[in-house]
Amino acid sequence: MLPAYLPNNFAALTGGGMPIDMGRNWTDGRRILGDGKTIRGFVGGVTAGILIGAVQMYAEISGLVPWFPPHTLTAVILLAIGSLLGDMVKSFFKRRQGIDRGGEWFLVDQLDFVVGALLLTLLFDPIWMLNTMTIPLLIVILVLTPLLHRTVNIIGYKLGLKKVPW
């Protein structure tokens, strides 16, 4: 899941510049996504996800981590892209709900990227997904991700890397 976990962090670190929505508003007069979703951040986040996935694949192939499930390059790319697409879909709906950038949306903020990553991977690499993601593993991911997400965000907040701890 590292190719899905890292892109959001690296999107924030590498972001800035042109927003993906090009500053446009939806029919409700609110921004489609907002200034926090940028082209540079998307590219940086996906790149980081693919790089960590490549490192994982190397570690798996060379026998350094025999307990890791085998990854395919396709799955790594889909997990990384799906992670950021899930985050963008969440941002779209947050704007529709009137929740500003940085505003908290409990559990949705913690699971959006995982759901996006898993759904995109299921759609385009179903064989890998069905062979790798067992029901017990999915339950562990869905339970531990919010805790991990919150912990990492609190650390980022305390280090001054995030404006809010969620």
Swiss-Prot record:
InterPro entries: CarS, CarS_archaea
Domain of life per record: Archaea
Enzyme class: transferase
Primary localization class, coarse: membrane
A GO BP annotation: glycerophospholipid biosynthetic process
Gene Ontology MF, one: CDP-2,3-bis-(O-geranylgeranyl)-sn-glycerol synthase activity
Subcellular location: Cell membrane
Catalytically driven reaction(s): 2,3-bis-O-(geranylgeranyl)-sn-glycerol 1-phosphate + CTP + H(+) = CDP-2,3-bis-O-(geranylgeranyl)-sn-glycerol + diphosphate
Swiss-Prot/TrEMBL cofactor(s): Mg(2+)
Keywords: Cell membrane, Lipid biosynthesis, Lipid metabolism, Magnesium, Membrane, Phospholipid biosynthesis, Phospholipid metabolism, Transferase, Transmembrane, Transmembrane helix
Membrane topology note: Multi-pass membrane protein
Pathway the protein contributes to: Membrane lipid metabolism; glycerophospholipid metabolism
Transmembrane segment boundaries: 39-59, 61-81, 104-124, 127-147
EC number(s) given by UniProt: 2.7.7.67
Gene Ontology annotations for the cellular component aspect, listed alphabetically: plasma membrane
HAMAP family on file: CDP_archaeol_synth
Similarity comment text for this entry: Belongs to the CDP-archaeol synthase family.
Function: Catalyzes the formation of CDP-2,3-bis-(O-geranylgeranyl)-sn-glycerol (CDP-archaeol) from 2,3-bis-(O-geranylgeranyl)-sn-glycerol 1-phosphate (DGGGP) and CTP. This reaction is the third ether-bond-formation step in the biosynthesis of archaeal membrane lipids.
The protein's name: CDP-archaeol synthase
Source organism of this protein record: Methanospirillum hungatei JF-1 (strain ATCC 27890 / DSM 864 / NBRC 100397 / JF-1)
Taxonomy of the source species: Archaea, Methanobacteriati, Methanobacteriota, Stenosarchaea group, Methanomicrobia
